[in-house]
Amino acid sequence: MDAVDSTRAFVKGVKRVIIKVGTAVVTRADGRLALGRLGALCEQIHELNSQGFEVILVTSGAVGVGRQRLRYRKLVNSSFADLQKPQIELDGKACAAVGQNGLLALYDTLFSQLDVTSAQLLVTDNDFRDPEFRKQLTETVESLLNLKVIPIFNENDAVSTRKAPYEDASGIFWDNDSLAALLALELKADLLVLLSDVEGLYSGPPSDPQSKLIHTYIKEMFEGLITFGDKSRVGRGGMTAKVKAAVYAAHAGIPVVITSGYATNNIIKVLQGERIGTLFHRDAQKWAPVGDVGARDMAVAARESSRRLQAMSPQDRSKILLDVADALEANEKLIRIENEADLAAAQQAGYEKSLISRLALKSGKISSLAKSIRVLANMEEPIGHVLKRTEITDGLVLEKTSSPLGVLLIIFESRPDALVQIASLAIRSGNGLVLKGGKEAKRSNAILHKVITSAIPENVGPRLIGLVTSREEIPDLLKLDDVIDLVIPRGSNKLVSQIKESTKIPVLGHADGICHVYVDKSANMDMAKKVVLDAKTDYPAACNAMETLLVHKDLVQNGCLDELIVELQIKGVVIHGGPRASSLLHIPEARSLHHEYSSLACTIEIVDDVYAAIDHIHRHGSAHTDSIITEDHEVAEIFLRQVDSSSVLHNASTRFSDGARFGLGAEVGISTSRIHARGPVGVEGLLTTRWIARGSGQVVDGDKGIVYTHKDLTSHA
């Protein structure tokens, strides 16, 4: 998720950037300065300044700050009788004069904390009528930028001669948005960023769920179609003013991005090429609009198709899965060809062996996937299952039944087999599905998606399962909390963390797979060797592979640990040690005890007893899967009861923590969450519940005449 968006590739050539921050961002709803937002703004400018960018700031807010201060001053100097009189609106010029001092003093304080120097430049509309002024202004700004000083511009409203409506034909600029656009031209900026109190330009009011964020503004496409709301609650501008300024600058060849000033890192993201906010660019009409038909339409289509799927009989839903399994086997040769093309590209690109291993659809994999789908098809019908049946009162019966969640968004990295498992689970559970796989498996995912959706009957439709092919659509999808019901990320810690930080939609999954095997002093060592080797070497890249081997201290003294290490090394496993093991065994110390290798490597640490092992797991584990090898059943029960992980095993490999091996048919992922599903997530984890009541005219009427029986009828369901 960190590649530059194709429409934002121009940012690589940006050096001089003008940032305009409006009053709605500078101040809070009560008129006071928004210190948190201003602090975040200054930190971003400092970071850009240190990276060699030339940053110019255009700020609003002086009038608002001054008004708040003067109102307070007037209040403390007023008698009770004065307060009863009609209040006269404060003069805006006086507010500007008072507020300018306080606003710039705050900027100076914040920048000083970051060892950044700032300079104040107040301008008026009339100043720009003088060519000599423009020349001197440019020279001054150039000097400041060469000294790494941040020029801070604001219109000098205290002495401005212009009056409302501020848009007469004689004006050179009318607000700080148009001032920023004018400065972008005068100072030859490479980019103009206009910070707003919303995420960008929407097709309608941002509060309307049907309004879409426009990522790239194309005048010919959107002019006349966009509905603007009110102007800014505190300033002279608003979105209309920002769009006019952006169109003006973009027409002159300066790209403009309108984005939210409320987010703490948006300016950095814009300059990293992320597709946030709305871009105005002179060449925008030449670009194919990216994602304009994508995100919401795909999710809505998946929901509509899922409702048709739910309306089918259980037998018909099962038949779809059987048809999918047959289609996979019938197209195995074509699937393997596309997968081999992905593998060749990954090897040529120099990807890590662990990623290439996850990417490969090895011999027999398609048959194995088809078999698991058939098992899933023949499982008990999961939808509409009556979990509880209660008689509320005579003639009124309430049922708690299983029900699909709705629409799932699954984001996964390099495992194309995950697409098959997830799609089959979605069909079985009656859910709509939107998939986004890793770019390294692009061809494999495309052919698998085509084969699977081709097997879905027309009365449900292939749009039951959508496949996102562009990274740029992910941020849009993550905002659709009114359409998408659950996000399940499958991949690296970085991927899962990014998803959790970027959405309001519930997220199910795990960030790490730090799985432990603890070999107790009473372990059968032949069994221990077999289990440890399987847990580490059967599939080192899997999230349920052993990453840390814990051994009882007695196994050091009797030489059993040495035997385990030799067996691991014979299999090519690179050994790292915890602090204790590293010191005693003279092996390289692990960089962290919370580390997922996803390769033929592991950490070994020595512990005093089962309680120390449990403590280590709780401190350094990820609540995924942990196993104990012991012949002492009392010790085993302590471990099984006290280790707080989603799957805990006794005398068995961590590799058993898998949906298919647990008999779930397949899994959509493994969850370490404590809410909803936990552990391998199969069909049941993709269901919720709802209540269905069947009555015969009952009314509450203040509970008069109602005799509540609350009789449990579950056994009769």
Swiss-Prot record:
What GO molecular function annotations does the UniProt record carry, in alphabetical order? ATP binding; glutamate 5-kinase activity; glutamate-5-semialdehyde dehydrogenase activity
Q: Which residues bind ATP?
A: S196, D197, R236, G237, G238, M239, T240, A241, K242
Keyword field: Amino-acid biosynthesis, ATP-binding, Kinase, Multifunctional enzyme, NADP, Nucleotide-binding, Oxidoreductase, Proline biosynthesis, Transferase
Biological process (GO) annotations? L-proline biosynthetic process
What pathway does this protein act in? Amino-acid biosynthesis; L-proline biosynthesis; L-glutamate 5-semialdehyde from L-glutamate: step 1/2; Amino-acid biosynthesis; L-proline biosynthesis; L-glutamate 5-semialdehyde from L-glutamate: step 2/2
**Alphabetized Pfam families for the sequence:** AA_kinase (PF00696), Aldedh (PF00171)
Which residues are substrate-binding?
A: S60, D157, N176
Task: Please describe the organ and tissue distribution of this protein's expression.
Answer: Expressed at high levels in leaves and is inducible in roots subjected to salt stress.
* UniProt region (Glutamate 5-kinase), positions on chain: 1-296
* Recorded superkingdom: Eukaryota
Q: Which family does it belong to?
A: In the N-terminal section; belongs to the glutamate 5-kinase family.
What PANTHER family would the database entry show?
DELTA-1-PYRROLINE-5-CARBOXYLATE SYNTHASE, GLUTAMATE SEMIALDEHYDE DEHYDROGENASE
Protein name, per record: Delta-1-pyrroline-5-carboxylate synthase
Q: Which organism is it from?
A: Actinidia deliciosa (Kiwi)
Q: What is the lineage of its organism?
A: Eukaryota, Viridiplantae, Streptophyta, Embryophyta, Tracheophyta
